[in-house]
Amino acid sequence: MTSNFDTSDKNAQKGGDFVPRLAMINDIAGFGRCSTTVSLPVISVMKVQVCPVPTSVLSNHLGFPLCHFDDYTSHMRDYIKVWNELGLTFDGLYCGFLGNEEQINIVREFVEMFRPPLFLLDPVMGDHGRAYSSITETHVQKMKELLPLADIITPNITEACLLTGTPWKDGEWTMQELSGLCLKLATLCQTDSTLSLSEHFHDASNSVIDTS
């Protein structure tokens, strides 16, 4: 059966205006105002075509003591393979929560397969000084391997501490401490990535340090 569906980049045109196409690798959480359910409408209203790759379906985010967790790992490669066979291309990749180490491997494969011009990595692993229940030390080490592939990383301070082996500190962090944390992350990135920390700031305008 022959399809008349055209998957070329001209499908990203509407009335002559270019519509960027973003692949989003992230979970779907039913409760908690996070992940794909929040990101998709926000990015879509910015006139970007969002193409989700679900990593898991959760009853709620992992900050709660209980959670129904439906792992999608076994489907992800087949899902992505079809995109590749259709000849789809993407102007960017946004990666959020990854439920296990194998999903990190799949993200690496996605980057190698599609070569997105822009890769934003949100290394979702914890909050308020604690790793989420599903996050192991092996997971943290594997996440470090993704950092050099990303153009932008957006860890909160908890995740930055996990990635750099920095002890968690309760209370406010000084700009000097945060700058030091960003420099540690820049060393892990090994590229001209832009770093953004989003937790425990009085002045959010100071939360981005460009390491280029």
What do these predicted regions represent?
Residues 2-133:
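Conserved N-terminal subdomain of the carbohydrate kinase-like
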Residues 134-212:
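Conserved phosphate/ATP/ADP-binding segment of small-molecule kinases
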